[in-house]
Amino acid sequence: DHAGTVSKAHKQHDVNSVLYKVYEDI
């Protein structure tokens, strides 16, 4: 399912962005 793959990748990107912001704050 292409749409599901894109959605999953987008969610993973969001998680990585949040983690990156957290590490920047440290």
Curated annotation (Swiss-Prot):
Domain of life assignment: Eukaryota
Tissue and organ expression note: Hemolymph.
GO molecular function terms listed in the Swiss-Prot or TrEMBL record: oxygen carrier activity
Family to which the UniProt record says this protein belongs: Belongs to the tyrosinase family. Hemocyanin subfamily.
Keywords: Copper, Oxygen transport, Secreted, Transport
Protein name per UniProt: Hemocyanin subunit 5
Calcium as UniProt keyword: no
Secreted in keyword set: yes
Broad class of the protein's primary localization: secreted
Subcellular location: Secreted, Extracellular space
Its job: Hemocyanins are copper-containing oxygen carriers occurring freely dissolved in the hemolymph of many mollusks and arthropods.
GO cellular component, one term: extracellular region
Native organism: Maja squinado (Mediterranean spider crab)
